[in-house]
């Protein structure tokens, strides 16, 4: 059944402050990363690091996601807008985050943290990779609730009509409701590409990576699998997703910026998986109990 998107992006209000679902999804993403990371730390999957160290890593990662995601969006998708008004970089409440920018931010943050703690960078990345997919899924759910980043038109029975899409922008909400009830808007149904990404980049990637990382793996393997899966899934979904308005298609009337940025991830993933064939395996070392650590 074709669905009319009518979700209020505002979850609730606290006086004059409006709390958006998108912000709550970010909180859910960081909480899931903390809970999953805690489980891995307690099983000794990052030797030499306790919960205090992991909390520090999570803080670095949060900064990397927010700063990298915002800067990446401006550079990759809204560069001309940024040049015209550089202060727009700080208007995060207006939306605009890039996964690829956020990934770059996390890589830099993890590199700094690994250097600070004298750990191998890819041991840290292999630890972090399984914590990320659920956060990606929450982010895509936030995109869906906000009615943004929709897909192309579809005749599929699960299509979604987005009232804020350009083809309906001149119609009043009451008109849209009446026309939807009469079945007069079915030709405007779109692929819920946000939900496709939530399922693939969130649920499927989490199940695969978490299961794969349950056993000790060779260095580079988990990171490589993450990069490969994300690159492939994102490249595929881009075929049914509307390209970003300021850019459109970059070549062949189908190649998008998201696909171009995903190709290096696929290549890096394959290289890392190949490197893992001759790399050492990091064996778990359970962290010392808090009381023992304090006695030292």
Swiss-Prot record:
Task: Provide the transmembrane region boundaries.
Answer: 10-30, 57-77, 92-112, 119-139, 194-214, 220-240, 254-274
Q: Taxonomically, which superkingdom? A: Bacteria
Tell me the keywords, alphabetical order.
Cell inner membrane, Cell membrane, Membrane, Transferase, Transmembrane, Transmembrane helix
> What Gene Ontology terms describe what this protein does at the molecular function level?
phosphatidylglycerol-prolipoprotein diacylglyceryl transferase activity
Its EC number(s): 2.5.1.145
> Per UniProt, where does a 1,2-diacyl-sn-glycero-3-phospho-(1'-sn-glycerol) bind?
140
According to its UniProt record, this protein's enzyme class is transferase
**GO BP, sorted A to Z:** lipoprotein biosynthetic process
Instruction: Reply yes or no: does the keyword Metal-binding apply.
Output: no
Q: In which pathway does it act?
A: Protein modification; lipoprotein biosynthesis (diacylglyceryl transfer)
Concerning PROSITE patterns, the annotation shows: LGT
Q: Where in the sequence is the signal peptide annotated? A: none
Annotated Gene Ontology cellular components are: plasma membrane
The record, for InterPro entries, names: Lgt (IPR001640)
Q: How does it sit in the membrane?
A: Multi-pass membrane protein
Name where it's found: Cell inner membrane
Q: Which Pfam families does the UniProt entry name for this protein?
A: LGT
Record flagged with keyword Cell inner membrane: yes
Tell me, in a sentence or two, what this protein's role is: Catalyzes the transfer of the diacylglyceryl group from phosphatidylglycerol to the sulfhydryl group of the N-terminal cysteine of a prolipoprotein, the first step in the formation of mature lipoproteins.
Family, as annotated: Belongs to the Lgt family.
Task: Identify this protein by name.
Answer: Phosphatidylglycerol--prolipoprotein diacylglyceryl transferase
Species per Swiss-Prot/TrEMBL record: Xanthomonas euvesicatoria pv. vesicatoria (strain 85-10) (Xanthomonas campestris pv. vesicatoria)
């Amino acid at each position: 059944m074709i669905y009319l998107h009518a979700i209020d992006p505002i979850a609730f209000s606290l006086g004059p402050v409006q709390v958006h679902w998108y912000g709550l999804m970010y909180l859910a993403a960081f909480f899931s990363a903390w809970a999953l990371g805690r489980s891995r730390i307690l099983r000794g999957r990052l030797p030499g690091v306790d919960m205090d160290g992991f909390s520090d890593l999570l803080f670095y990662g949060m900064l990397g996601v927010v700063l990298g995601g915002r800067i990446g969006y401006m550079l990759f998708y809204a560069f001309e807008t940024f040049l015209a008004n550089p202060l727009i970089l700080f208007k995060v409440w207006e939306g605009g985050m890039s996964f690829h920018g956020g990934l770059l931010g996390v890589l830099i943050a993890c590199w700094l943290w690994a250097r600070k703690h004298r750990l191998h960078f890819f041991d840290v990345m292999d630890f972090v990779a399984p914590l990320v997919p659920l956060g990606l899924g929450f982010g895509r759910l936030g995109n869906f609730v906000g009615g943004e980043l929709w897909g192309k038109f579809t005749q599929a029975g699960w299509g979604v009509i987005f009232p804020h899409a350009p083809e309906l922008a001149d119609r009043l909400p009451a008109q849209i409701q009446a026309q939807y009830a009469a079945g007069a808007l079915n030709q405007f149904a779109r692929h819920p590409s946000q939900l496709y990404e939530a399922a693939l980049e969130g649920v499927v990637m989490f199940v695969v990576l978490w299961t794969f990382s349950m056993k000790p793996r060779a260095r580079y393997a988990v990171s490589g699998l993450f990069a490969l899966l994300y690159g492939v899934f994102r490249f595929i979904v881009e075929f049914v997703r509307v390209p970003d308005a300021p850019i459109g298609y970059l070549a062949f009337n189908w190649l998008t910026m998201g696909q171009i940025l995903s190709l290096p991830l696929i290549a890096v993933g394959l290289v890392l998986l190949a490197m893992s064939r001759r790399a050492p395996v990091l064996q778990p070392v359970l962290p010392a109990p808090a009381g023992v650590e304090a006695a030292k």
